[in-house]
Amino acid sequence: MKYNRIYINSNLAENSKLELARDYVHYVKTVLRLKIHDSLRIFNGSDGEFLAQITQIGKNNLSVVLKEQLKKAYIESALTLAVAIIKSDKLMLTINMATQLGITKIIPLITRRCQFRTVNIERLMKCVIEATEQSERLNPPIIEQAITLKDYLKKNNNLILYANEHEKVKHSILHISSLLSKDIAIIIGPEEGLLMMS
């Protein structure tokens, strides 16, 4: 049987009891419609994933016991997505898909052609957690504060992949496979493309 997953940013261990935060009470009771003795999966990136059984549900509290470890924590390859700040719905979709595909760090970029200069990091984190729960990952990507493209390029020493639609293809991604042992960063520009002066 496949159980619902919940990301918890707390220490997890077999046979331990865990009190879930108030935010989860509504979600577990009303959205998932779980009751006492029902099971769910609880996970985080540092301890892994555990099968948990609900032992108590109150108006504002919910307790579970972690029965058994289902997955051990693991280290993912470093894969950064530096994405221009675009319209909210499109940015959320990009963040969701990037999370499901295994991106480990997301950096919102401020470019000359950006329509927006700020981003709601808390909202992005909620999107990342939901996508992590759906995609069977253990580690949600880290979301950094927005930075200008110029500053990002100055401080970055990763291998950067960038598709320039105005240039003829010089190298296929298959030809650079020998470089893929390095940390990789992918840059996605705004809808109008990146200006090299950015």
UniProtKB/Swiss-Prot annotation:
Q: What are the subcellular locations of this protein?
A: Cytoplasm
Query: Gene3D superfamilies recorded for this chain?
Result: 3.40.1280.10, Hypothetical PUA domain-like, domain 1
Report the EC code(s) recorded for this entry: 2.1.1.193
Q: Which Pfam families match?
A: Methyltrans_RNA, PUA_4
Annotated keywords? Cytoplasm, Methyltransferase, rRNA processing, S-adenosyl-L-methionine, Transferase
Gene Ontology cellular-component terms for this entry are: cytoplasm
Q: Which GO terms describe its biological process?
A: rRNA base methylation
Q: Name one GO molecular function term.
A: rRNA (uridine-N3-)-methyltransferase activity
- Which reaction(s) does its UniProt entry say it catalyses? uridine(1498) in 16S rRNA + S-adenosyl-L-methionine = N(3)-methyluridine(1498) in 16S rRNA + S-adenosyl-L-homocysteine + H(+)
Q: Which residues form the signal peptide?
A: none
| Its job | Specifically methylates the N3 position of the uracil ring of uridine 1498 (m3U1498) in 16S rRNA. Acts on the fully assembled 30S ribosomal subunit.
Q: Which family does it belong to?
A: Belongs to the RNA methyltransferase RsmE family.
Instruction: Please report the name of this protein according to its UniProt entry.
Output: Ribosomal RNA small subunit methyltransferase E
